[in-house]
Regions:
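Residue-level recognition of tetratricopeptide repeat
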Residues: 2, 36, 94, 128, ...
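TPR alpha-solenoid repeat register
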Residues: 5, 39, 97, 131, ...
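Canonical tetratricopeptide repeat
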Residues: 8, 42, 100, 134, ...
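Short coil/linker segments at helix-helix boundaries
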Residues: 49-82
């Protein structure tokens, strides 16, 4: 019915980077079916991608000479986090919502919270290479080279070959 049509069209909009239209379609589903997990997840993803796009455009916007860098707007990801939390309320083992939430925490500078959320992801599924990779990068950021090395090695074993280059570059003891 309508739900499938909105899901398909919303997903197409998402792939075409037409985030506002995707958000409209996923929101239309949620008006009728507030617990539709796919619509909730895709709505949160669309918001996150839209914010990332806005931020990337903002980064390329010419600034007035001497303008303070602090003038750059801080993205508020609270709606995105709320969307992923709503997914987890419906299905507490929905690992993709947790994974995306961890990435949002990292983008938002909430490093410890991101690491803990990646820990939850890996407790649910020990074979998500990207979770090891991303957590490994956060460990590098926090100066925990041994933990970073272990995570990046695991990511490499699971198929992210570039993880080995990161180890060579950042995890060597000086």
């Amino acid at each position: 019915g309508d739900t499938d049509a909105y899901l398909i069209r919303g997903s197409i909009y998402l792939n075409q980077k037409e985030y506002a239209k995707a958000i409209e379609d996923f929101s239309a589903i949620l008006e009728k079916e507030p617990d539709n997990l796919l619509a909730l997840f895709n709505l949160a993803n669309a918001r996150m991608l839209m914010f990332d796009y806005i931020e990337s455009v903002d980064d390329k916007t010419p600034r007035i000479v001497g303008e303070q860098q602090q003038m750059q707007r801080k993205i508020d990801y609270s709606q995105v986090i709320e969307g992923y939390n709503e997914c987890l309320r419906i299905d507490s083992d929905f690992v993709f919502a947790l994974f995306n939430m961890a990435n949002v925490y990292a983008k938002n500078g909430e490093i410890e919270r991101a690491i803990e959320t990646f820990n939850q992801v890996l407790r649910l599924d020990k074979d998500i290479a990207e979770a090891y990779f991303n957590r490994g990068l956060l460990y590098i950021y926090t100066g925990q080279k041994a933990l970073a090395n272990a995570d990046l090695s695991k990511a490499g074993e699971l198929g992210i070959v570039s993880a080995y280059n990161v180890i060579k570059r950042y995890c060597k003891e000086n």
